[in-house]
């Protein structure tokens, strides 16, 4: 699946199951909530915080998919072709950061 197809799948899902998109501000709040859930898992599973018993069954992939779903919703409702935007951003980052990380002593 590419990003364009993912955007279409989300749009179809919203039309068939979600009635309509939440407004952009609501979706931004939803995105913040979902990113917080990802952060909680990472902080407790891979960071220094102790993992609570109730967090041990949390699925990081599922939470990342929640983040992606809301990002795709925001792109759809603001008429952004995320496939195109991502490709442009990757090109910018490649030109800008071509040697940057290779010369970073902290990464060696």
Protein language model features and the residues they cover:
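Flexible "arm" and connector segments at domain edges
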Residues: 1-64, 68-108
């Amino acid at each position: 699946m590419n990003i364009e197809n993912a955007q279409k799948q989300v749009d179809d899902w919203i039309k068939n199951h979600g009635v309509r998109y939440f407004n952009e501000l609501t979706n931004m709040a939803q995105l913040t909530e979902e990113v917080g859930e990802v952060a909680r898992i990472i902080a407790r599973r891979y960071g220094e915080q102790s993992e609570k018993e109730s967090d041990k069954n949390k699925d990081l992939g599922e939470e990342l998919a929640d983040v992606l779903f809301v990002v795709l919703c925001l792109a759809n409702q603001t008429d952004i072709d995320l496939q195109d935007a991502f490709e442009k951003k990757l090109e910018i980052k490649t030109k800008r950061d071509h040697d940057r990380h290779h010369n970073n002593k902290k990464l060696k």
